[in-house]
A protein has these predicted regions:
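A short, surface-exposed loop/turn module that caps and links secondary-structure elements
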Residues: 35-61
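Alpha-helix boundary/capping residues
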Residues: 18, 33-36
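Enriched for short, Lys/Arg-rich terminal
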Residues: 2-4, 10-27, 44, 58-67, ...
Length: 89
């Protein structure tokens, strides 16, 4: 079970940018966050563990171009990205 949900500064910037850009995508992001809090590393959005410099992080598809990148650490969800492709962490 997930306790707290937090965003890195970049993750929050991505999230807030969807508020003014695309409410439909924002709704999908919220649905993914809800599913992550319930199911962790399984569920909708094709969960995938990331490798190399993103080892320990997972991604889920928001749409064909965008991904939500996150990790669960000590029962807390940290969202590092809600946008296009993977940035170096």
């Amino acid at each position: 079970m997930i306790g707290n949900i937090s965003f890195t500064p970049d993750g929050w910037e991505d999230y807030v940018s969807w508020l003014g850009e695309d409410k439909r995508t924002l709704k999908k992001i919220l649905k993914l966050i809800e599913d992550i809090t319930r199911n962790g590393y399984t569920g909708i959005g094709h969960p995938e563990p990331l490798k190399d410099n993103l080892s320990g992080y997972w991604s889920r598809e928001i749409d064909d171009k965008n991904r939500i990148v996150f990790r669960v650490d000590e029962g807390n969800l940290e969202i590092t990205q809600c946008g296009s492709h993977y940035r170096d962490k």
